[in-house]
């Protein structure tokens, strides 16, 4: 799918004062080399304070930086979702596996956010699920709902339950998993959150729901 392109807008912070624009771009968007950024600058894709930039300009706090990325072909992904619940404040949808929740990693229009907002422009996700995960995503339709959900999201009032099909034979019926979670390299999208010894502390409780000869269904 060829999208319509996108204007990535940021404001220069004080810690970046005096850098050349080219150095700042290569640091801010590290997925591309300085050489690639210079080509984009030469093509007129970057503006600093509304003026097309060359890359040699020094940057200063408070300046507006815009990268007008031309249209690009997005990776394929599912484009259908199921509405599970809706009222004036909340929207709950079932996200299929393979669909990103938010733009990123080459995805812009082929995301749950864009598809939901085509039907409900005032809906904004309260949380996200990874691209490979299917399940319920909650959207707030009002600022009041967003504030209340965000305030309660990391409290015992909100419980997250995941189900997974795991390979191998589990010796026990219940597990406590304390493996730290952090960013690890990914060959296609740069990095993903996964088991990482230097990551943040995490705690998951897993219970075997059913078994086969080579797998188990966990919750």
Q: Which residues make up each language-model segment?
A:
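RNA pseudouridine synthases
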Residues: 1-219
């Amino acid at each position: 799918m060829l999208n319509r392109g996108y204007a990535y807008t940021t404001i220069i912070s004080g810690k970046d004062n005096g850098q050349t624009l080219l150095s700042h771009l290569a640091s801010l968007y590290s997925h591309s080399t300085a050489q690639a950024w210079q080509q984009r600058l030469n093509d007129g894709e970057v503006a600093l304070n509304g003026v097309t930039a060359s890359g040699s300009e020094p940057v200063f706090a408070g300046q507006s930086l815009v990268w007008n990325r031309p249209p690009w072909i997005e990776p394929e992904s599912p484009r259908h979702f199921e509405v599970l619940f809706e009222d004036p404040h909340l929207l709950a949808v079932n996200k299929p596996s393979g669909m990103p929740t938010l733009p990123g990693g080459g995805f812009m229009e082929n995301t749950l956010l864009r598809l939901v907002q085509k039907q409900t422009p005032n809906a904004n996700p309260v949380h996200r699920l990874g691209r490979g995960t299917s399940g319920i995503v909650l959207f707030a339709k009002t600022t009041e709902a967003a504030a209340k959900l965000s305030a309660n999201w990391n409290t015992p009032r909100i419980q997250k339950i995941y189900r997974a099909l795991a390979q191998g034979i589990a010796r026990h019926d219940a597990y406590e998993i304390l493996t730290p979670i952090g960013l690890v390299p990914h060959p296609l999208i740069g990095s993903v959150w996964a088991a990482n010894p230097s990551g943040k502390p995490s705690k998951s409780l897993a219970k075997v729901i059913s078994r086969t000869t080579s797998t188990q269904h966990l919750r």
